[in-house]
């Protein structure tokens, strides 16, 4: 049976680190920023890691 294709939408949104962890960007940044606090906007600039339970689901898509 052939390999499954990688989901290209996911491929553009995540990076896999050298240790095998998955980095992702944060949501809620594209618009309506005036309703969010400065702290929310500042913290959402940082990238975060995908949780272990989510990684199990995403592994099939990668």
Curated annotation (Swiss-Prot):
One cellular component term from this protein's GO annotations in UniProt: cytosolic large ribosomal subunit
Composition-biased stretches (Basic and acidic residues): 53-62
UniProt biased composition (Basic residues): 1-26
Gene that this polypeptide is encoded by: rpmI
Keyword tRNA-binding recorded: no
Domain of life: Bacteria
Molecular function via GO: structural constituent of ribosome
Family of the protein in this entry: Belongs to the bacterial ribosomal protein bL35 family.
Name recorded for this polypeptide: Large ribosomal subunit protein bL35
Keywords linked to the UniProt accession: Ribonucleoprotein, Ribosomal protein
């Amino acid at each position: 049976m052939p390999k499954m294709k990688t989901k290209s939408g996911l491929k553009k949104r995540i990076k896999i680190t050298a240790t095998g962890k998955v980095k992702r960007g944060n949501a809620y940044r594209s618009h309506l920023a005036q309703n969010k606090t400065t702290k929310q906007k500042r913290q959402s600039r940082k990238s975060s890691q995908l949780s272990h339970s989510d990684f199990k689901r995403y592994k099939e898509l990668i």
